[in-house]
Amino acid sequence: LARAAGRPVVVLAAMLQHSPLMLITLERPDIQTPGDLANKRPMLEPGSNELLPYLHRYTRSRQGETLPYERGVQALPRGQADVISAYSTTEPFTLQQQGIPYRVFSPRDIGYDFYGDNLFTSENEVFNQQERVQRFLQASLKGWRYAMDHPEEMINLILEHYPSGAGREALAFEARETRALMQPDIIEPGYMQQDRWQQIARTYQEAGMIKAVPNLTPFLYNSTQASLRQQRQLLDRSVAI
């Protein structure tokens, strides 16, 4: 969306092959299918724009027609919303622990398959700070690989040094679900395809969120192209001198 708006952002890597974002509602007789979400009260958290094409397809709701996000998944049993944005890695476990029956609706069910936990930077950073970008990217990938290979160690680390209120069982659930979305056993962490980004852009276009699919070649990080561009810039400066 930012690239389509003309902002010079660059995506470095897609850490999750599938986004954890989905819609969740309480199990109730009047909400059985996505079409039943029409005329219901959706509550979306900031940064969940990827759910709008799915929601718009069935309800014609747009971003300005959703409720302000507050209280998280507890908004459902309190009757503050009929359906909310949620992460498959966390909210289902919370409702399970509370013994509350729920139903989920995922954009993936109709082919809206977004990447998750993407790393972004700016064109300026890519072309002027190549070494820093590379170090950051490689460190991030290394960290993710280690976390996937040592989930118990990461859980202990979080509980001891970065307590978030989530207990061991909740963190273990999150680790399992994250691994399923990342698929590190069959896909290299960070891997992404231009064709898939193209399809994501078309999904936004069909929902009326962007006017046209932008040129995505400069949007996807390519260390070789960045190096060549920097070399050309240095050569141009040398010629000018």
Predicted region positions:
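Short, glycine-/small- and polar/acidic-enriched structural segments
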Residues: 1-69, 73-78, 82-86, 105
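Class I S-adenosyl-L-methionine
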Residues: 3, 52-56, 96, 159, ...
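Helix N-cap/coil-helix junction residues
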Residues: 7, 60-61, 100, 164, ...
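Generic structural signal for helix capping and beta-alpha/helix-loop junctions
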Residues: 19-21, 52, 93, 112, ...
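Structural motif detector for alpha-helix initiation sites
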Residues: 33-34, 123, 216
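Pocket-lining segment of extracytoplasmic ligand-binding domains
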Residues: 71-164
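Secondary-structure end/capping motifs
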Residues: 127-209
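Conserved C-terminal helix/tail region of periplasmic/extracytoplasmic solute-binding proteins
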Residues: 198-241
